[in-house]
């Protein structure tokens, strides 16, 4: 029985899933918008939102926690130097999911996941 089990399996084992979401979270922080399947985007929210909340309070302990979750110093620096201050006044809801049709090969539902309030330069680069 699967009582109280949350999260999607996505036909992967736990280490593959953990690595995939670590990489996707890094990509989302770096580019501020990525295109992926809708279920992955919905699950990625559960990884990225706590990271940004962590980055709102800059401390050595929080930086180490963020590094443990991302394994990338450049991502940690962007989280704490740019994204944390940007979302200081926002109480959650840092991401937006936009549906964008279906993938040609397997008809999987696709979506963009983006950080809200991202600067116009990042929006132009995404187009």
Swiss-Prot record:
HAMAP family from the UniProt entry: Ribosomal_bL17
UniProt similarity note: Belongs to the bacterial ribosomal protein bL17 family.
SUPFAM superfamilies with a match to the protein in the record: Prokaryotic ribosomal protein L17
UniProt xrefs under NCBIfam families: L17
UniProt keyword annotations, A-Z: Ribonucleoprotein, Ribosomal protein
GO molecular function: structural constituent of ribosome
BP term (GO), one: translation
One Pfam short name: Ribosomal_L17
Protein name: Large ribosomal subunit protein bL17
Cellular component, GO annotation: cytosolic large ribosomal subunit
Gene of this entry: rplQ
Quaternary data: Part of the 50S ribosomal subunit. Contacts protein L32.
């Amino acid at each position: 029985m699967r009582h109280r089990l949350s999260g999607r399996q996505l036909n992967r084992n736990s280490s593959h899933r953990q690595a995939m979401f670590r990489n996707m979270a890094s990509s989302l922080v770096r580019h501020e918008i990525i295109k992926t399947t809708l279920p992955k985007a919905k699950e990625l929210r559960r990884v990225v939102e706590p990271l940004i909340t962590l980055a709102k309070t800059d401390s050595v302990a929080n930086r180490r926690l963020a590094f443990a979750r991302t394994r990338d110093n450049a991502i940690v620096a962007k989280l704490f130097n740019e994204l944390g201050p940007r979302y200081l006044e926002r109480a959650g809801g840092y991401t937006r999911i936009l549906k964008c049709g279906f993938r040609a090969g397997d008809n999987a539902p696709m979506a963009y996941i983006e950080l809200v309030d991202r600067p116009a330069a990042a929006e132009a680069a995404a187009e």
